[in-house]
Amino acid sequence: MAGRDAASNQLIDYKNSQTVSPGAITTGNGAPIGIKDASQTVGPRGPILLQDVNFLDEMSHFDRERIPERVVHAKGAGAFGYFEVTHDITQYCAAKIFDKVKKRTPLAVRFSTVGGESGSADTARDPRGFAVKFYTEDGVWDLVGNNTPVFFIRDPILFPSFIHTQKRNPQTHLKDPDMFWDFLTLRPESAHQVCILFSDRGTPDGYCHMNGYGSHTFKLINAKGEPIYAKFHFKTDQGIKNLDVKTADQLASTDPDYSIRDLYNRIKTCKFPSWTMYIQVMTYEQAKKFKYNPFDVTKVWSQKEYPLIPVGKMVLDRNPKNYFAEVEQIAFSPAHLVPGVEPSPDKMLHGRLFSYSDTHRHRLGPNYLQIPVNCPYKVKIENFQRDGAMNVTDNQDGAPNYFPNSFNGPQECPRARALSSCCPVTGDVYRYSSGDTEDNFGQVTDFWVHVLDKCAKKRLVQNIAGHLSNASQFLQERAVKNFTQVHADFGRMLTEELNLAKSSKF
């Protein structure tokens, strides 16, 4: 059909793929239904009977179709594919996924916006989630990142407040520029991420023209038990491509599902998107001498000092068979690690180790890892966790549900023990506020001076001013003060743009 894309033809494709006649409609318990288009009533105009179990079955299930929306990253797209190792990194990491060149590991990916609801526009100015689930022989490994290498805050205790400011005002239920800019200007460590957000990369052209980053610092352990710090990068093989402000705004109204559609159509037409994975590594000794806190997620590691090391390629070659089953129910958690990969002292990472799994248990139930898309199907689950709502397995039959035991229960894994690193830690227990004690602007200055050209600087300032001009005057002044600390030209240009915006409103 001319003028229709692959996504528009999904139902036609489904019909054409069926090789047998359609079966009978059934109830949820499998009983065939003879009449589907009428309720059971007393006479043609009479009331519906309580014994109409077909209606009760249909309506009671419909009433429960929606599950809680993700509190962040609600709007997203998913796809499946594989990761293939192209370069040997076993000197750094003993995880089985990397144990030989040309090895392929199946994976699932979910891309998303962050602040919007599930019906919001794909082209909104927002960071993009970039989460990868690797189904390895050592269990599921989730690398849960974004399309930016940094984040707004470095202490997880501020995360709920930060997200509240990105959502809606509790009284007006409107997006509130005062909330948005009040928090960000009071937390100057956000300046790095804010500048990336309001740069051209804040509105990527779909999900396939953006990079992905693990963002956090992790520890890799090799077969000798030697640890090293690392960061993960995914560079798009399609090339970076962004939407200008006018196009992004136009698509928000004409095709709010633009990015979901683009990903689906690429895969359906066999134009499989791919990304190349790289790592940066830093020894413990280098970390001690690093000019910044190497575990600060508001900063990057210089690629000149810590060059990118190629690892492999991620290819997406299958669309979800059902969105709810394989995308809405997919659950990523930074706590899903495998032997050879461990957390670093990154505080934001530590907060996410708890919160992601916790929110999945709320949203999907305590046995969410039994949902097929989340199940570590390459290994047999053997532990001492039992029961719980919606346990749909054999519940590990009659195996002992305690440890240690004398009755042939599962034992500790020597390999996993050998790949557990020992990390000496000393210090005084206290609540250390880092808002003003760290360098919050040095790397942002580098971004302004060395990354952005003249035109990109102008667009960044215009994008910030367009949003900031809707905030209260004192918040505009505070923002200008912060950005002036990045660079005097930045503050001057922003002041000029805000004055232009102010005059245009009168």
From Swiss-Prot:
Catalyzes the degradation of hydrogen peroxide (H(2)O(2)) generated by peroxisomal oxidases to water and oxygen, thereby protecting cells from the toxic effects of hydrogen peroxide. Heme binds at residue 356. It comes from Drosophila melanogaster (Fruit fly). It comes from the Eukaryota. GO terms for molecular function: catalase activity; heme binding; metal ion binding. InterPro entries: Catalase, Catalase_3, Catalase_AS, Catalase_clade1/3, Catalase_core, Catalase_haem_BS, Catalase_immune_responsive, Catalase_sf. This is Catalase. Its cofactor is heme.
